[in-house]
């Protein structure tokens, strides 16, 4: 068994060695290592070496056999090789020589080929470079275009170019470093465009703020031209024509919008517009403004996704500007130009906002505009109320009213509600009336102060017609009189009448363009005219009448003048009716109070005449110098009284043109005052004693007064009517001079008694003065029987008079 086993193992080993040998024979030498490693790893490498030696010997025997077999052929080959050797050397030399010649001859070709190689390489590089540049060139061109657009402030096209550059061109060459720089710079460029466009917008806003005055002035000129065209040419209602005007305005606005699109290259600000076809045509407000900065900035912010930020900024800045515009200068009320500039700025502001509203989508909306307008309206009205209250010149107030109307009409063209402005004008109308009244107070004062208070003399028909043309006066008798002749009134009558008409015209001027009905205009004029008559003119007349240095002649003329002015009131009524076309019979029509005014003035003048006459009488009476203790009689009236009567006669002679009752009342009043003053003179306390002679002299003066009364200084009195003014004096003097006490005491209290007008108190007072005189007249009088009897009689009469007085009081 063991032998069999060993034999089997020996066979396996031999087979393995055989395989290794075959592998060594067939394998490349470089790869024999692993094979040999397997032999050394085994345990039979000795036997393998034996096998290997055996195999080598076998191969050596085969090689030897082969060499022996081919030896003769080898010898022959060597012999032939030796023969060829010489030829080979010769050929070698020829080849070497040929090679040398070829190298020499091909050197230039090699150089040319090297140059060609370099050229080919350069050409390939250039071609590649051109291809790359052609790919990069649009990017560079777009970037250059972007820079040019930003340099020329074409920001919106620059933003569009930046978008194309970012999304279309840069992705194609994104692997280049300069492209990466561009990509990194794009946000900065966007911010730069954003900042520059915002800077342009700020410049635009600042320019608009500075030039709002010019814009508003132009818009108001357009409105004025349109209104003139409506009134003169078209004869159409103003509202309708204004709507047409607004349509025309927006036609021009639309054209201007096209020229100021976001791609417009115009700068911001105010444009200098010149009309080559018609130099006189007023340029439209929109023609003065380049709105492209707003449009560009709006589009830029919209593209950048910041439209809301832009809208908020724009509205905030415009609100600030609105507050500045609406703040009036402190001295605005001093001149009309101050108001005009204020209105121009407001109109300019809202013209711009209205244009922005209609040419942009949502930058401003109607609610925003309405909010601004409400604020502007309230502030404007408050400012006008404050500053107009300082105006004392009616011409300035009227010009202000016309300016406010134009201001309102201009803004109404752009769709702004202006009813509150017209309501405020009604308030200013009252102030205008007050300033007119103050002005006319001065006018009336100058007229009344400069008047000579003498009838107007006329020497020719032309002069006569001129006066009649100024004042409605008709007098057939005066017309028949030859020249020269006089009007009954003085110059202030036609002057005052014409000034009243001028006042009415001034009131009418203010009512124009206020959209008032004829009835409202008529009512306004009549109320203002009534104030003029009842307050201003009345006060002026009263001041003249109450003047200290006014004379009776002036007062008489004032009465005559006011009488004629009173008659002219109906013509003033007709005058107002003609200019307002409102009949006086219309319901609620206010009547003129001129008649009352002139009546009151006339009555005041009459009272002043009475007072003046009385004062003159008092002045004459102050000259009275009676010797109450005299016993002599001059048999003539006192000098002062003669002068007084002469004065009264001359005065009443002037009263011929006065109404009869006025002259009669004045004459009666003067006589009564004279009688009363004489009575007071007789009874005054300072006269403690008087004699019968003094009483008789006093009686002569009273007779002079009675003679004056009987002479009829003023026509129209019935017989003895004027003498009744002196009846108290006459009966008192008759009682004492005739010493008719028995009759007086017997008839006292009876209605037909002779001394009915003698008061017992008065009689007692005068009797006491005579009683004291009788007692002290002569120290020996008491020894005379008749004197004693007279004294007893006086005492008796005095006692009886006291009894009458006491019984009367009881």
UniProtKB/Swiss-Prot annotation:
InterPro entries: EXOC6/Sec15 (IPR007225), EXOC6/Sec15_C (IPR046361), EXOC6/Sec15_C_dom1 (IPR042045), EXOC6_Sec15_N (IPR048359), EXOC6PINT-1/Sec15/Tip20_C_dom2 (IPR042044). GO terms for cellular component: exocyst. Pfam families: EXOC6_Sec15_N, Sec15_C. One of its GO terms (biological process) is vesicle tethering involved in exocytosis. Residues 79-118 form a coiled coil. Residues 258-282 are annotated as: Disordered. The keyword Coiled coil applies. Keywords: Coiled coil, Exocytosis, Transport. Belongs to the SEC15 family. Component of the exocyst complex involved in the docking of exocytic vesicles with fusion sites on the plasma membrane. This is Exocyst complex component 6B. It comes from Mus musculus.
